[in-house]
C-alpha cells in the first residue's frame, strides 16, 4: 500500500467521527447557552486568523469552510443541517486556519460563545465527547492533507533556523508545510510575495501574509500559541497554581488541577510534550497495547487540560522565581517578554531535562541539519533508504532505532558500554536485537562529523580496539541523556549533586521546614508550596508513566498545601525572598 493509499484509507475510516452531527438531545443541551442567528448568502461567520471563535451549529442552510491558496479559494468542507464548524483551535483559543461563509440563500445557526463552550465541554459529557472527538480528528486530517497550505515555512533546504521553525510548528501541532526556496514551488511563492534570499526564513501565515526572519516568539504569536496571560495595562497575573514545563508530569498536573477547580497556568518554553513528545512510539504506556506516538499522547493531554480551563502560554521562558513565604501568593514569577508579574499560591516545577550534546568534532555545525535529538516523521523523511546513526543505550535510543528502521536502509546503534540491557527495557532490547537492519556497535563513540552544508558522514571509534571507521550518513540521533533544567531557580530550592531537585523527606530539615507546623508533602521542595515532579526531580523514575503519576500526585500535595494556608497554619518563618543570582 502506497502512502497515498494509506491517506485515503485514513480519511475514509475517520470521516464519521470528524463530521458527526448533533442529535436533538445534544442541541437541547446547547440551546440555552447559544445565540440563534439568521444569515444570508455571502455573510462571513469568521475569517482566517481570528481567535476565540466559539462553536457554530447549522440549523438550516449551507456553509463553506475554505482557505485561500495564492488568490484561489479551496473548499475544505461544507456544513449542512446539524453539522458544527471548527477544529481544536476553538479549544485552544488559537488562530482560525480557514474562513467560513454562507453559501445558501438563507441560513440559521446556533452560536455558542467561546467562554460558554469551554464550560459546556467540561460539564456536559453528552455533548463534549462528540464535539471534542470531532475537533481532534479534523485537526489530524488537516495535518495529513497534502493540499492544505496552512502556515508555510519558506527557507533554504540547509537553513538550520528554518528547520527549527518547522520543528516548532510541528511539535505544537500547527498544520504547516516546509517549502525549499530553491524548488519550483519556492521560487514561484517568493516571486508572488516579492521575497529574496535575504528575507529567509519567511513564515507565510494562514492569512497569506509573510513574516520575514521571525523569532520563535513571533511565530507563536502569529499562530496563536503565545496567549496573553495579562490584559492590557495589567501589572499582575494571579493563579492558584502555575506549572512550569509541559512534559508528561506538567500536563498530568494541569489536567487534574484544572478539572478540580484550580486556576491553572502552564508555562512552556518550546512545545508541550517534553522528551516523551519526541518519542515516535511509547510501547509500555498503560492502556495502549500496541503503543502510542509520544507527541500524539501529550497533545491529547494538552487538549484535555484546555477542556477543563487550563491556560497555556508557549513559548514562555521563566527567568526567575521570587519567594515570599508569608504571602497568600507566595511565588512571583518573571517571564521573558511579559511586562506583568505572575503570582501563584503554589508552583509545580516540571521542567524536565535538556538533551546532552555529543562530544564530537564539528558537532555544532550540524545541529538541526544532521544532528537531531528526536526521531519523528519529519526526521524520518530525511533518513529514508539511508544509513543513519543513533547514539545511546536507553529506551529513547531503542525507540528511535526501531522507528527509523522502518524506512532507513540501515540503523547503526552506537553505545559506549557492552550491554544494551543495562538501561533499556528488556522487551525493547530484544526487539532491537532482532531487527535485521539494526546493527549495534558496542564500546563505540562518534568522534568527528563531516559535510558541506549538511551532515554527510561521521567517524566512529571503537574504544576497545582503537579502530576507526567512516560512515556515510545524513543524520545522527543523539539520545545520551539529559541535565535538569534548574538554572533559573533560587538557591533555597535544594538540589542533589547532579542538579536535580530534592523533595519530601530529603528536605524535611531545610530551614523553611524546621519552623513549619506541617511536614513537606512527598513532592514538595525545600520551600513550602513549591513542588517538583517528573524528570527534574531527584530520585524520580525516568519514564513517561512515572512522570504522569507524579504530576497527579503533586496536585494532591498542592491541595493539602493550599488547605493548610486557608486553615491558618502558614510558615512561622519571617519573610523570605529569593531570586536568581
Where are these regions (language model features)?
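Cytosolic regulatory regions built on CNB/CRP/Popeye-like sensor folds
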Residues: 1-167, 171
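Short aromatic/basic micro-patch
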Residues: 21, 55, 78, 111, ...
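A generic structural signal for short hydrophobic patches within well-formed alpha-helices
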Residues: 27, 117-118, 219, 318, ...
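Structural motif
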Residues: 62, 106-108, 328, 341, ...
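Beta1-alpha1 glycine-rich phosphate/pyrophosphate-binding loop at the start
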Residues: 153, 157-166, 170-184, 193, ...
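FAD-binding core/adjacent interface of flavoenzyme oxidoreductases
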Residues: 166, 188-244, 259-260, 277-278, ...
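Rossmann-like dinucleotide/flavin-binding elements
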Residues: 233-272, 359, 365-367, 373-426, ...
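A Rossmann-like FAD-binding core segment of flavoenzymes
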Residues: 298-344, 349-351, 405-517, 560-581
Amino acid at each position: 500500500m502506497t502512502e497515498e493509499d494509506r491517506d485515503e484509507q485514513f480519511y475514509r475510516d475517520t470521516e464519521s467521527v470528524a463530521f458527526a452531527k448533533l442529535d436533538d438531545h445534544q442541541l437541547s443541551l446547547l440551546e440555552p447557552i447559544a445565540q440563534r442567528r439568521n444569515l444570508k448568502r455571502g455573510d462571513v461567520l469568521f475569517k482566517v486568523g481570528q481567535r476565540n471563535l466559539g462553536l457554530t451549529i447549522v440549523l438550516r442552510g449551507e456553509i463553506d469552510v475554505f482557505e485561500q491558496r495564492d488568490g484561489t479559494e479551496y473548499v475544505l468542507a461544507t456544513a449542512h443541517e446539524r453539522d458544527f464548524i471548527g477544529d481544536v483551535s476553538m479549544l485552544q483559543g488559537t488562530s482560525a486556519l480557514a474562513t467560513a461563509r454562507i453559501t445558501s440563500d438563507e441560513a440559521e445557526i446556533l452560536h455558542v460563545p467561546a467562554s460558554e463552550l469551554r464550560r459546556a465541554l467540561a460539564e456536559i459529557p453528552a455533548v463534549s465527547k462528540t464535539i471534542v472527538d470531532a475537533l481532534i480528528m479534523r485537526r489530524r486530517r488537516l495535518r495529513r492533507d497534502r493540499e492544505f497550505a496552512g502556515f508555510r515555512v519558506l527557507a533554504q533546504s540547509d537553513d538550520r533556523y528554518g528547520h527549527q521553525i518547522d520543528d516548532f510548528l510541528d511539535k505544537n501541532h500547527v498544520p504547516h508545510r516546509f517549502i525549499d526556496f530553491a524548488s519550483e514551488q519556492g521560487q514561484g511563492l517568493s516571486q508572488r510575495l516579492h521575497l529574496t534570499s535575504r528575507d529567509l526564513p519567511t513564515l507565510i501565515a494562514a492569512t497569506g501574509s509573510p513574516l520575514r526572519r521571525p523569532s520563535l516568539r513571533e511565530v507563536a504569536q502569529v499562530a496563536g500559541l503565545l496567549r496573553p496571560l495579562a490584559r492590557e495595562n495589567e501589572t499582575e497575573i494571579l493563579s492558584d497554581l502555575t506549572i512550569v514545563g509541559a512534559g508528561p508530569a506538567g500536563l498530568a498536573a494541569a489536567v487534574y488541577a484544572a478539572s478540580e477547580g484550580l486556576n491553572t497556568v502552564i508555562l512552556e518554553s518550546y512545545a508541550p510534550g517534553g522528551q516523551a513528545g519526541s518519542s515516535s512510539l511509547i510501547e509500555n504506556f498503560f492502556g495502549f497495547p500496541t503503543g502510542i506516538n509520544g507527541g500524539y499522547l501529550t497533545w491529547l493531554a494538552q487538549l484535555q487540560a484546555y477542556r477543563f480551563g487550563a491556560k497555556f502560554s508557549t513559548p514562555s521562558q521563566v527567568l526567575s522565581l521570587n519567594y515570599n513565604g508569608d504571602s497568600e501568593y507566595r511565588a512571583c514569577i518573571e517571564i521573558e517578554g511579559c511586562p506583568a508579574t505572575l503570582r501563584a499560591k503554589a508552583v509545580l516545577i516540571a521542567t524536565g531535562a535538556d538533551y546532552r550534546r555529543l562530544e564530537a568534532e564539528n558537532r555544532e555545525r550540524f545541529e538541526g541539519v544532521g544532528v537531531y535529538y528526536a526521531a519523528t516523521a519529519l526526521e524520518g523523511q530525511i533518513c529514508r533508504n539511508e544509513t543513519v546513526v543513533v547514539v545511546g543505550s536507553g529506551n529513547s535510543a531503542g525507540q528511535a532505532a526501531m522507528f527509523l528502521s522502518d524506512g532507513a536502509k540501515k540503523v547503526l546503534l552506537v553505545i559506549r558500554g557492552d550491554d544494551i540491557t543495562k538501561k533499556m527495557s528488556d522487551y525493547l532490547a530484544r526487539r532491537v536485537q532482532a531487527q535485521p537492519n539494526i546493527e549495534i556497535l558496542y564500546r563505540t563513540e562518534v568522534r568527528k562529523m563531516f559535510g558541506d552544508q549538511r551532515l554527510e558522514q561521521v567517524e566512529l571509534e571503537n574504544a576497545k580496539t582503537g579502530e576507526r571507521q567512516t560512515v556515510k550518513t545524513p543524520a545522527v540521533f543523539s539520545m545520551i541523556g539529559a541535565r535538569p533544567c534548574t538554572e533559573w531557580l533560587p538557591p533555597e530550592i535544594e538540589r542533589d549533586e547532579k542538579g536535580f531537585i530534592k523533595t519530601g523527606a530529603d528536605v524535611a530539615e531545610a530551614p523553611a521546614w524546621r519552623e513549619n507546623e506541617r511536614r513537606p508533602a512527598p513532592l514538595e521542595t525545600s520551600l513550602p508550596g513549591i513542588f517538583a515532579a517528573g524528570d527534574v526531580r531527584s530520585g524520580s523514575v525516568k519514564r513517561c508513566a512515572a512522570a504522569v503519576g507524579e504530576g497527579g500526585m503533586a496536585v494532591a500535595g498542592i491541595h493539602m498545601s493550599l488547605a493548610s494556608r486557608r486553615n491558618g497554619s502558614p510558615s512561622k518563618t519571617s519573610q523570605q525572598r529569593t531570586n536568581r543570582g
